[in-house]
Structure formats: C-alpha cells, structure tokens
Amino acid sequence: MKTPIELKILDSRIGSEFPLPAYATLGSAGMDLRAMIDTTMTIAPGETQLIPTGIAIHVADPGLAAVILPRSGLGHKHGIVLGNLVGLIDSDYQGPLMVSCWNRSNSPFTLDIGDRLAQLVFVPVVQAQFKLVDEFDSSDRGEGGFGHSGTK
C-alpha cells in the first residue's frame, strides 16, 4: 500500500541531476536522502554539520510521521551518524528536510555533492491520552529497569 505524501523540490538538481527519493527495492523500508550541498565538504573528526537534502515534505496525516535514519554503511565503515541520532518529522511540519551529520570517527570524512547520506522512513503514530492511576496492575517485570531482563 502506498500513501501519497506531498513533496516540494527545493533544489533544482533533484529530479534532474539526482533522482527523487525512491525505494530501491520492493522490500525497502526507507528512501535515500542526498547531500544537496554546493561543493564537496569535509567533516572533521568530532564535528557536526547540518546538511540540506533539497526537499521538503508535508505528511499531513496525523496518523503518520517520518523519521530520518542513518545509512548503516556510513556509520559502520566511516563513523558517520546522525547528530541527533533520529530525526523526527511531525505530520504538520512543512519545512526543508535537513540531516544533522556527526563524524564520530578519528578521520576526516569527505562528502560529495549528491552523496546518499541518510534514509527517510514513514511510520504510524499513536497519540496517547494519559489515564492517571495511583497504582499499576502487577506485571512480570514490575519496576525492573536497565539490564533487568539479562543479556543471554
């Protein structure tokens, strides 16, 4: 099932020099976002840069949100991850999509124009309404926190 999402092109190279975000395979969950920078840039070790993607989206449906996630190869091979770890795009946001790019490695990382930098995934949203209680019904876990369930 495909849900229509409004997309605005902010950089004219998208759709001409570089393709619109799209799913690479039938099983893909995310669409690649590209670095729509004006010139090749180097991100120094420990540095964070905000990178434009050249697009804006409007999800519009309050039952959906978008998340910007890292591409696994960049983090594993080069130490390039998202500065905010996950970018959450609310359904009513209409501004440009930007990627906070953090070089957590000890080596400079060169980013070329149009490089695939992150991925965009759409997820369902449930808006909760809190019900105030004095006590919770008991559960198997109870108040056990970090590491409570073990490692094996």
UniProtKB/Swiss-Prot annotation:
Q: Does this entry carry the keyword Coiled coil?
A: no
UniProt cross-references to InterPro entries, sorted A to Z: dUTPase, dUTPase-like, dUTPase-like_sf, dUTPase_trimeric
Which BP terms from GO are recorded? dUMP biosynthetic process; dUTP catabolic process
Q: What is its EC number?
A: 3.6.1.23
Q: Does the keyword Oxidoreductase apply?
A: no
Q: Name one GO molecular function term.
A: dUTP diphosphatase activity
Cofactors required: Mg(2+)
Sorted UniProt keywords: Hydrolase, Magnesium, Metal-binding, Nucleotide metabolism
- Matching CDD domains: trimeric_dUTPase (cd07557)
Q: Where is the signal peptide?
A: none
Which of the seven top EC classes does this enzyme belong to?
hydrolase
Q: What does this protein do?
A: This enzyme is involved in nucleotide metabolism: it produces dUMP, the immediate precursor of thymidine nucleotides and it decreases the intracellular concentration of dUTP so that uracil cannot be incorporated into DNA.
Q: Which PANTHER family does the entry mention?
A: DEOXYURIDINE 5'-TRIPHOSPHATE NUCLEOTIDOHYDROLASE (PTHR11241:SF0)
> What is the designated name of this protein?
Deoxyuridine 5'-triphosphate nucleotidohydrolase
Organism in which the protein naturally occurs: Shewanella sp. (strain W3-18-1)
Q: Which gene encodes it?
A: dut
